[in-house]
Structure formats: structure tokens, C-alpha cells
Amino acid sequence: MYKRPFDLIILTSAHIFLFPLLLLLWTVIPLIIWSSDRGSIFYIQIRTGEKGKKFKVRKFRTMVENADQLGPVWTKAKDPRITRFGKILRKTALDELPQTLNIWKGEVSFVGPRALPVKEQEELEKSIPGFNKRLQAKPGLTGYSQVYNTTDEPTVKLEHDLKYINTMNPFLDIKLLFISLINTILGKWDSREGKSSDSYSNIKN
């Protein structure tokens, strides 16, 4: 399978050629998050990965502390729980940066179906026949569904995930990574309505 060598080549190359930028991001982002409310820099979720394996994910916090106690699990448009800096992180998807650690560990790939919180995955498996089929591939930071999906309907996401699983190849991954990079540069990752909030299955440090 090409996935593991593909991920390691890209990850290693990025850290070599973009080291100054990555060092800046890893320094500035935590400082801004902490200085805004002296709260935690990361939040942690347990998600469901390939073949149902559970793993721990860290992301930069984009919502106020204890967001799960202040509103619904699902993020709404113009959600007041999202901080001002959190909006920037979400638009650029830089809140996902800590998940590169999961790529190093082999739990996540650059491209693949989005890993869902355990409870969300279990609930959707109960209501949508065949939803567990998306677990046949390693989850990804970005993917076919994340790039092309214009709706939050789980059945549509499943259709896109299965389409990727059945056709995945290095050239498709490169294409999806390129589109994702453009979205990050232009700040187009801002459609989070109806998706799981930062507080879903949150585990406090």
C-alpha cells in the first residue's frame, strides 16, 4: 500500500523545507490561544479510526472553555462559542495542525475519510446502513468528502467516502492535497455549520 510511504515523504519534506514556518505556527498559535483567556491550548477527542480502532486526537482549541456546557454538541452558524482567533484557525484549518502527530504515529493519513468522535460514529452506524464501511480506510486530515461535500448530510458524506476508498491512488491524493492547500491559503475552510463542535467527546487534560 502506498499510503504510509506517501505520508512520510510529504511529512518529512514539509518539515525540512517549511521548518521556519511550522516553527512559527507552533509558537504563535499556542501563545495567542493562551493569552486570549488563559485557557487550555489543546482539546482532546477520542475518535474512531481504521477498522474501528480508537485513537486520541489533539487540536488547537477554537472555542471558549467548557463549550460543551454552554450550547449544543453541533456547531451552528455564527456560533458564539467560537473565539475570534478560533474563527481564523477554522477558516484556514490550522486548528488541525496538531494532528500531524497522528500521521507520524500512523493513526491518520494526509488524505482519507474524516475520523469522527466515537459516539457520533456509533450513532450514525445505528441509523445509516453500511456507515461502518468508511472505516475500511485510514482516516485523513483532508479527503474527498471534506473537499467536495457541500452538505452536512451523513449519507452524502458516506457516498463520497466510499467513492474515495474505491478509487484512491497517489494522484488523487496529490490533487486533494493541492485543493486543500489552496483552501487553507485562501481561508475557505469556513463551512463548519452542522459539524461536530470542538467539545464533542471532549476529554479534559
Q: What is each model feature region?
A:
Residues 2, 6-9, 57, 78-82, ...:
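Alpha-helical membrane-protein architecture signal
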Residues 32-33, 73, 131-135, 162:
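Short, P/G- and charge-enriched loop/turn segments at secondary-structure junctions
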Residues 43-81, 141-159:
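Short, glycine-rich, amphipathic interfacial segments at transmembrane boundaries or analogous
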Residues 1-65, 176-205:
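A hydrophobic, helix-centered structural microdomain
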Residues 43-44, 111-113, 119, 156-157, ...:
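Short, hydrophobic secondary-structure boundary micro-motifs
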